[in-house]
Amino acid sequence: MPKMKTKSSAKKRFKITATGKVRAAAAGKRHGMIKRSNKFIRDARGTMVLAEPDGKKVVKNYLPNGL
């Protein structure tokens, strides 16, 4: 059976760390910041590590060959 292709959209959204965790940008920062709290805006800055079960799903379904 041939190798599964990596999803191009996932390549742009996720990065796998050296320890195997998955990093992604925080959601909810495209528009509508005026009604968000300053804490939300501050916490959503940069990237975050996905929870272990979510990271495993991303790698298995979208990034089978890593990056």
Curated annotation (Swiss-Prot):
Pfam families: Ribosomal_L35p
One MF term in the entry's GO annotations: structural constituent of ribosome
GO cellular component, one term: ribonucleoprotein complex
SUPFAM superfamilies listed in its UniProt record: L35p-like
Segments forming a coiled coil: none
Domain of life: Bacteria
InterPro entries: Ribosomal_bL35, Ribosomal_bL35-like, Ribosomal_bL35_CS, Ribosomal_bL35_sf
Swiss-Prot/TrEMBL keywords: Ribonucleoprotein, Ribosomal protein
Example GO biological process: translation
HAMAP family the record matches: Ribosomal_bL35
Family statement drawn from the similarity comment of this UniProt entry: Belongs to the bacterial ribosomal protein bL35 family.
Protein's recorded name: Large ribosomal subunit protein bL35
Gene that this polypeptide is encoded by: rpmI
